[in-house]
């Protein structure tokens, strides 16, 4: 697999878990700290007791002047910090295209644990979620989703010298997953299929699962294909488990590795935020129509 570097000029860190995006007038937030990108977990704000969203709406509408976005950071290549402390990634660029360029409003990202991100949204800690979040029935009972903006697959990442070459080979092994994710859900389904003969180690962030795989504490990681690919592109020590899977069975243009699920990402809203949801859907359609979406996609995932 060819190695790639997914870096792009991004946005400054404001501190306190808040990461600034561009404002409606085209300016960007001042960078208050410079943080080298690390495989360790970022400080996150996970409290759900007190609403913190303060952005005001534009006159005679429910559209904010600046939208506060909850996101589990880092989650390369969707949202992460560069060595210079800038926030970048596919979701970040989509946010810029949707909110700044289409809706003319500012945006800020707030780092939040994925496991508690939906309760935090519904408690008013931020306005929306953009965090490579899969649309599924369980989440749809608690939030409303935008139209899908990305298709992903759950995949299996192992060490290069591993004897694991199929999903069946996972029986009796130890698998690392991130808490609250559909990767964890896919692993739990395998655990049931194997009558419990699959041990799951759950981590607050996917970087913890990747580190455990490298260190030999788990034998595989189940996670989104693009995030697994980003990690595998950085080292010769990791590889995908290959073979046909759900995508191939569905006659889709399947990736060249085993797929456990087919999923669509969406932007999550509180269930009473219909006007803003509609405007965001219109903006998503517009960036697909004018080619902006394809440009962003090609930057992170083509080649």
Please name every model-derived segment.
Residues 1-112, 116-169, 173-303:
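Terminal disorder- and signal-encoded targeting elements
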């Amino acid at each position: 697999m060819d190695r790639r570097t997914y870096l792009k000029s991004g946005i400054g860190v404001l501190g306190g878990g808040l990461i600034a995006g561009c404002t409606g007038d085209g300016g960007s937030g001042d960078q208050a700290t410079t943080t080298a990108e690390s495989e360790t977990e970022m400080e996150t704000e996970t409290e759900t007791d007190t609403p913190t969203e303060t952005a005001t709406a534009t006159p005679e509408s429910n559209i904010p002047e600046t939208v506060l976005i909850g996101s589990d950071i880092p989650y390369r290549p969707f949202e992460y910090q560069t060595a210079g402390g800038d926030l970048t990634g596919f979701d970040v660029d989509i946010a810029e295209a949707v909110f700044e360029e289409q809706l003319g409003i500012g945006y800020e990202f707030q780092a939040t644990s994925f496991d508690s991100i939906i309760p935090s949204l519904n408690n008013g800690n931020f306005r929306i979620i953009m965090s490579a979040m899969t649309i599924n029935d369980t989440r749809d009972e608690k939030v409303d989703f935008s139209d899908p903006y990305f298709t992903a697959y759950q995949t299996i990442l192992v060490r290069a010298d591993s004897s694991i070459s199929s999903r069946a080979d996972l029986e009796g092994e130890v698998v690392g997953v991130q808490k609250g994710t559909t990767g964890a859900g896919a692993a739990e389904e395998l655990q049931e299929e194997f009558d419990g003969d699959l041990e799951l180690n759950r981590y607050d962030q996917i970087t913890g699962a990747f580190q455990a795989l490298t260190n030999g504490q788990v034998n595989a990681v189940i996670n989104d294909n693009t995030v697994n690919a980003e990690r595998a592109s950085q080292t010769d020590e990791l590889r995908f488990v290959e073979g046909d899977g759900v995508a191939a069975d569905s006659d889709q243009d399947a990736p060249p590795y085993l797929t456990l699920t087919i999923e669509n990402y969406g932007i999550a809203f509180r269930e009473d935020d219909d006007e803003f949801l509609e405007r965001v859907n219109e903006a998503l359609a517009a960036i697909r129509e004018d080619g902006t979406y394809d440009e962003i996609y090609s930057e992170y995932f083509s080649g």
